[in-house]
């Protein structure tokens, strides 16, 4: 039951009425949120519980139960309960509430209670304490992108190094250069591969540079960035706990209003990934006519 009235929720669901309404209101794609997105939101909730326990704002038993519930989610034990369609209205409110409700219900079970009672742990009053969709979702976007950065960079560094190695291996082979699909002036095959490696390196540098802006977090801005209902030390404590939980290098953002209202940093990071993809497509297009024969 919520202010709009009663609504049936599956008895075995860890989510609650807010999530159920979102399922009814936004049956758009039939997809579920990606795991990195869910993971990052749970990281934020875990860090918030630890922060509020540290400041004394949240009862230690409730905080410990929220942390334990978060750890279960992070161990992928409750994936089936994150059900809000990725395409939903607003700034991610339904996704935020899906996580709040799952953690609250599971925390209450761990404390000996039952699902749906929201006592002693409430999804809004405790799991979402001093938070808003408007600061958690922008922070989530930054964390989830940064969490995927390491594997991506490692993979492309391996490709770059392989291209550079082929550049050295093929440096004695002279071939006709190609412009407009016609023979041009001579060039060494090794030079071409060295150029592929150089382009990859430049693209990776742009990715890293754009990613660095994502390390500035606006968490603690609350609803509009001004930090209403938020303790003064909250942003710094959240940053410390998030660094410990995620293993990521993070910074307390200087202007939380700007970090909440603008997705420019995420758009710039996305553009560098798009540039990397374009480079790969271009390189493959270069190589295809060279390797297709005829063999001599």
Q: Residues of each region from the PLM?
A:
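Conserved, well-structured ligand/cofactor-binding cores
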Residues: 1-296
């Amino acid at each position: 039951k919520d202010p709009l009235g009663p609504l049936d929720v599956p008895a075995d669901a860890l989510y609650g009425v807010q999530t159920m309404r979102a399922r009814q209101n936004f049956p758009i794609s039939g997809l579920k949120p990606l795991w990195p997105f869910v993971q990052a939101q749970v990281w934020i909730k875990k860090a918030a519980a630890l922060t509020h326990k540290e400041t004394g704002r949240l009862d230690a038993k409730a905080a410990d139960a929220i942390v334990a519930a978060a750890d279960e989610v992070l161990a992928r034990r409750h994936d089936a309960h994150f059900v809000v369609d990725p395409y939903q209205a607003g700034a991610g409110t339904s996704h935020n509430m899906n996580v709040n409700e799952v953690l609250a219900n599971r925390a209450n079970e761990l404390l000996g209670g039952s699902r749906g009672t929201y006592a002693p742990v409430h999804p809004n009053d405790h799991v979402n304490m001093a938070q808003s969709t408007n600061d958690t979702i922008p922070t989530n976007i930054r964390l989830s992108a940064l969490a995927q950065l390491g594997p991506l960079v490692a993979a492309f560094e391996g490709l770059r190094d392989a291209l550079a190695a082929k550049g050295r291996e093929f440096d004695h082979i002279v071939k006709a250069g190609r412009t407009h699909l016609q023979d041009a002036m001579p060039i060494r095959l090794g030079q071409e591969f060295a150029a592929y490696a150089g382009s990859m390196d430049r693209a990776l540098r742009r990715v890293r540079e754009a990613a660095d802006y994502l390390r500035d977090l606006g968490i603690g801005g609350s609803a509009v960035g001004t930090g209403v209902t938020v303790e003064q030390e909250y942003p710094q404590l959240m940053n410390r706990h998030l660094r410990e939980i995620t293993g990521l290098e993070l910074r307390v953002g200087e202007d939380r209003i700007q970090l909440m209202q603008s997705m420019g940093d995420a758009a710039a990071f996305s553009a560098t990934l798009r540039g990397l993809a374009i480079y790969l497509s271009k390189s493959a297009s270069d190589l295809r006519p060279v390797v297709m024969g005829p063999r001599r």
